[in-house]
């Protein structure tokens, strides 16, 4: 989920809307369709098929992704996320004059404004665009490609703590809901709850580790006597690469959620994490979309590991391995092994 372009300067609005946003919808719908097809294979007994991919994809777009995206986009607009076809707006910075240092003992001098651009006033061009509509499906579809190069750290893409919360909830919504969908379709709700509980346990353990590591601060700075204790004047901890409006906790929570769901959205700089914090993020990425994972891909990724676990457990106790009434044989294990090893081999 590497974003190697600055959308606000590289892409036109029509490209963002008709190219990238459409692909965000189709990507998420494809994952949901594949997951639903796999669940049907577990649920059905005598049926000859497991459904039509195109029908499932259209249903996922029209009945799930589009309605949720509209609601989320409106909520984000209410928080200050921009939604306009205007390319940019010009603004005059607050600091038009700057002070310059002079030799010791002399008075401080004030320079005149820089080279005039508009009536002698410095002007800043602020990029705008249809941001809220793209951010909504970026988060709901666990895609990650932001309208701006700074992604969800940009103040026009994620301006407030509440918009940050909405974006995190959007990331977790579909992967969590699909666990309950699985339990409902196979006729055993506890099966879906079991998958959700397994995902949540791993997520919470790593979340606690990153919280502790980032709030403890950078040990190299501690040796230099830098004050990294939380107080009324600072959030404390390792604030390098993090937005002040979010602080440690909101940044870390977003970090863990976005890496768990295999989403490329970020609201802080992951390269600036402490060693333990970065280790947890890398571990979530390298799990291969198992802990919640992307829209649809997290569910079928976890089911692949469930099949393997059931097979090993069956061999250990001397019983024929079965999962939801379906026997797990050599062919199923070969296919599960290919699915597990595919991503590491490609990487």
Name what the model sees in each region.
Residues 1-347:
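Membrane-proximal intracellular helices of multi-pass ion channels
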